[in-house]
Amino acid sequence: MTLLFDIYPAIGHLNASFALANQWREREHRVVYCAVEAEHKKIIETKGFECIMLDYPLESDKQELRVKGLRFIGECFSSVFTQKRKHAFFREIADWENRITSLSPDRVYLDAQCALRTALYHKLGIPVVLVETMPLSLYDPWVPPFTSGLIPKQTSISRLGIRLAWEKIVIVRKIRNLFFSMLLCRQDYFSLYKRLFLECGFPFEEKIDWRRPFIIGIKESKILSMNPSSLDFPRKYPPNCQYAPSRVDLMREDPMLNQRYARVMEEVCLQKQQRPDIKIIYCFSSTVMGFEKRSKIIFMTIRDICLRNPQFVFILSVGKYHNTSYLLPCPSNL
């Protein structure tokens, strides 16, 4: 059986997928990755997997505006008459389709942050499993969206806040899509993908799930969450969703390779002794490079959450290139 891994181009997402890919390889299945960056292709091949290079069919509107500015708006305006942008998009899609067809995959593990490509695989008749490499993004009335900064409590006020947080995502996303559609004369990312859905015979209005904290999702899709359920807030077991098992032996007694965690574990044990009922929330942020402004916003948000919830203890693990001075003055419960 040939399995295609179409993973979002970020190191953290790739690393999360390797655990699953290794299991399939051990069962003597063929595993093939597709990559858009040469650096990622090198990492994948170092792990012993096949990899093909595939360009993005379309860059995001924000990225195009960041690089081209007003020139991009002009290109979109002229494309209303020439259809240049639409034709270029569908040429990329045709190339993508030919490359995928040549592989003849029996199943695709598609990163949930690339969910709009589900339509293409639907057209080719290839079953898709969406891989969530971050906390599960499915709507649950008792679990806040990951990006909200809310901590669920068993109260009516908490449930109302959670509901409003989910509705805010839908409203903001629709307003943003409408804004880009008008600004870019319906030559925007979302409008072109909507046309792809129609071309592929994939019902757009019925399948699009607006209630997702990171990016638009696809309803009724099979989902594999690479985060064990124990690392998420308690929630109802979602249909068509499977949690990956924990890949860490919590009872192991091997020497700690990174001694910076020793101090953290000592502090956690001390807190548990002093307050046995204490709740500990673990937060993590992977390596950030070239997103200093965004990193600052995230750190300030985490700091505010800690200050609003003194009854919890927070552990924050960060990757490279983070400026942790944004947390100063550091809350006592962080």
Describe each region flagged by the PLM.
Residues M1-L14, E37:
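Nucleotide-activated donor-dependent transferases that construct or modify glycoconjugates
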Residues L14-W24, E39-H40:
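Short amphipathic alpha-helix
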Residues Y33-S78:
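Conserved nucleotide-sugar phosphate-binding/catalytic loop shared by glycosyltransferases and other
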Residues L65-T118, H122, K168-I215:
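Conserved nucleotide-sugar donor-binding subdomain of glycosyltransferases
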Residues K86-W166, S225, S229-D232:
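Conserved nucleotide-sugar donor-interacting segment of glycosyltransferase catalytic cores
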Residues S191-A244, L250:
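Long, low-complexity segments enriched in small/aliphatic residues
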Residues F233-L327:
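Conserved catalytic-core segment of nucleotide-activated headgroup transferases in glycan assembly
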Residues S332-L334:
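Active-site donor-binding acidic/aromatic loop of nucleotide-activated sugar
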